């Protein structure tokens, strides 16, 4: 069932989150960026969001994969979009006024196996981008490939006594998973930091139950979002994500010369403007976008 644009859908709950005055231009009626509170529930503001988006001739819709389009699972290879989420994303991809993109920490090759080919892909936190037959890889990723291999071999040795920790080679980057492992995050991070210290040109960052290792280049999900929006000269941009690495994308929305909105999946302090509860809330939001907020045709620049 498609969500009610009044916001009374069970997946896009209304709540007593209060509006705050002031704020940046765009879809939000307040300045959530500096708040200590979690973003407001999106269901409280659907009527306003619909009014803004329905006037925009083109929307770039960017979404994380794990925890956003697909539930978090113990084994990352088993993560998959629920059928109803996949249908909702495909339906939006069929709209000429919508350009959906998945912006993920997963490798581009991994995303290709999971996502409809009509959807733009930004892998490894934006170090790789594929749109149709076009593919781009950040030059810094190739330059630091051997250093990354050495560092990950070092990490694997340091964590050998924790068999449930897994090092995933993603080509341009690597991820050390410790969900369900005996090793806590501090132990894993210490092992990664020690390995990275011996390899100039690499940097470690935290994710949800993971530590990411990547080339030390000025590139993150926010850069990917800016480029995707600018390439299409979009009139509106929406980013949906759950991870701490998605905060770069939420922050980048402020720099865009168009309507913009960040949607957090879950509840925590965030630079996002709104939130939904979970992957099913994302599904409801995608269906609502298709049915209520994004006309199938029309519009102009």
Question: Model-predicted segments: where are they?
Answer:
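Short, structured coil segments at secondary-structure junctions
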Residues: 115-118, 200, 256-258, 271
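Short amphipathic alpha-helices in soluble, non-transmembrane regions
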Residues: 151, 155, 187-197
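Active-site phosphate-binding/coordination module
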Residues: 80-168
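Mg2+-dependent phosphoryl-transfer enzymes with acidic/Ser/Thr/Gly-rich catalytic loops
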Residues: 27-42, 222-301
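Short beta-strand
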Residues: 165-169, 203-206
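Substrate-recognition "cap/lid" segment bordering the active-site pocket of phosphatases
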Residues: 124, 133-146, 205-234
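Non-catalytic pre-domain segments flanking phosphatase-related domains
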Residues: 1-65, 69-70, 84, 230, ...
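A generic structural motif
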Residues: 172-178, 210-215
């Amino acid at each position: 069932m498609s969500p009610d644009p009044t916001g009374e859908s069970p997946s896009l709950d209304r709540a007593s989150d209060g509006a705050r005055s002031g704020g940046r231009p765009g879809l939000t009626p307040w300045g959530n960026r500096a708040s200590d509170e979690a973003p407001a529930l999106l269901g409280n503001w659907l009527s306003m969001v619909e009014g803004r988006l329905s006037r925009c001739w083109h929307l770039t819709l960017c979404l994380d994969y794990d925890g956003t389009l697909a539930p978090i699972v113990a084994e990352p290879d088993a993560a998959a979009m629920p059928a109803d989420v996949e249908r909702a994303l495909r339906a939006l991809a069929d709209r000429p006024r919508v350009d959906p993109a998945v912006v993920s920490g997963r490798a581009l090759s991994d995303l290709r196996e999971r996502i409809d080919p009509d959807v733009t892909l930004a892998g490894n936190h934006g170090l790789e981008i594929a749109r149709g037959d076009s593919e781009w890889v950040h030059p810094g990723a190739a330059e630091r490939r051997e250093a990354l291999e050495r560092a990950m071999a070092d990490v694997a040795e340091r964590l050998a006594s924790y068999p449930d920790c897994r090092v995933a080679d993603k080509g341009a980057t690597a991820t050390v998973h410790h969900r369900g492992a005996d090793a806590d995050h501090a132990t894993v991070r210490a092992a990664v930091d020690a390995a990275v210290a011996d390899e100039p040109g690499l940097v470690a960052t935290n994710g949800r139950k993971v530590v990411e290792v990547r080339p030390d280049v000025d590139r993150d999900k926010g850069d990917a979002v800016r480029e995707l929006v600018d390439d299409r000269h979009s009139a509106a941009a929406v980013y949906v994500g759950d991870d701490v690495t998605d905060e770069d994308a939420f922050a980048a929305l402020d720099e865009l010369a168009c309507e913009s909105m960040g949607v957090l999946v879950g509840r925590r302090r965030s630079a996002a403007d709104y939130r939904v509860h979970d992957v099913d809330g994302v599904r409801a939001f995608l269906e609502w976008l298709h049915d209520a907020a994004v006309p199938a045709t029309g519009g102009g620049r």
